[in-house]
């Protein structure tokens, strides 16, 4: 695998620690207990949430969801809320972005808060203004401003730097309309997808 992070000085070549989010979501990659997710757009948030959850068969049972979000099923408390009791996260996750803006700032107006709250409840560390130095046996070497840091991680999952590939579109010669991520892969969200 060779990935180049668009706009970054780092190029990752054949590191066994580096995984594609596509392989992770398809179940084609073994993911360790400590993970760095590069890219805090919609895909990065979704992948982080996916990795923080414990595998289960089917949907989360409603009583479990109510407990996680602090909803009083009996209705005995004012406002129907009790202290939330989220489950322990399945992994230790650090979500990183190069931008200096708050993580998740550009997520959907009606759902972004849920994604941020979910990752917060799963103890996901969210780091902004990062530059990526290198990956080695010690982990992912980053800088936050002038501070150097090494994240001790088993895997680095890339959710950044996607570029639209239009070769098949051009080769086919048929009249298609390019939309969503096929047209412009950057900052993809459900509305534009």
What are these language model-derived features?
Residues 1, 115, 165-168:
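Residues within well-ordered alpha-helices
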Residues 1-7, 12:
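Single conserved hydrophobic/aromatic residue that forms the stacking wall/gate
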Residues 4-5, 87, 134:
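Residue-level signal for WD-repeat beta-propeller blades
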Residues 4-5, 126, 150-152:
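Short aromatic/basic micro-patch
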Residues 15-107, 142-193:
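Rossmann-like dinucleotide/flavin-binding elements
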Residues 104-130:
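N-terminal Rossmann-like dinucleotide/flavin-binding domain of flavoprotein oxidoreductases
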Residues 128-139:
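A conserved short coil-to-beta-strand element within the FAD-binding core of flavoproteins
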